Amino acid sequence: GVYSDHAAFNSSYAAVYWPWLQIYDAVNGVKVWCPPSGFMAGVYAYSDNTTEVWFAPAGLTRGHLTQPIKAEYSPSLGERDLLYGNGNAVNPIATFKQDGINVWGQRTLQRLPTALDRINVRRTLLYLEKVLSTAVRGLLFEPNDAATWTRLRRLVTPTLESLKTRRGLQDFKVVCDSTVNTPDVVEQNMVKAYIYVKPMKTVEMIQLNFVITAQGSSFTEAIF
């Protein structure tokens, strides 16, 4: 679609990509320009099929585009930084001489600088909400007591442990006990559980620092 700087976009459930891409229409024998949305659906699907939903659908490994002939415009490094930062949230599609056309960003449209301004984090939470909601359905209409709270913790922990092992989470903690399920909560026929997660961050900058050491000195002395 068309992005307008007058629209107050602010959501972690959406993302914007730019520029448009050109493909060959074999039916009509012409080249046409298309918005990147369709290509991005393919990138997301490829990323999910080859890795996991918490891996960013971007970069040379999962964000490489092979179908487009060319991009409408290839933003420079400075332009990409401007699109991606400084309060903006446009994911650039960049063209590199050796690596072709690649998705070079994974920001959501959330303006508040939290973990949810990244696509991989939002998709991780969507996955957890779906899987864990299904896992605890069997507890509905069970007695609302400590035994049920323990069962809930045991039901959700394996999935969280699995994500931690598979590089989806750095760490987590599940709280479902009398501290959150107070008499008032129980009186409402409700169970509350708080799942604290430390989502996995992605590498978006690489800094290489070169240090020249004097002849005769050891690297141990030079490292600081």
Regions of interest found by a model, annotated:
Residues 1-224:
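Structured, hydrophobic secondary-structure cores that serve as assembly/anchoring elements
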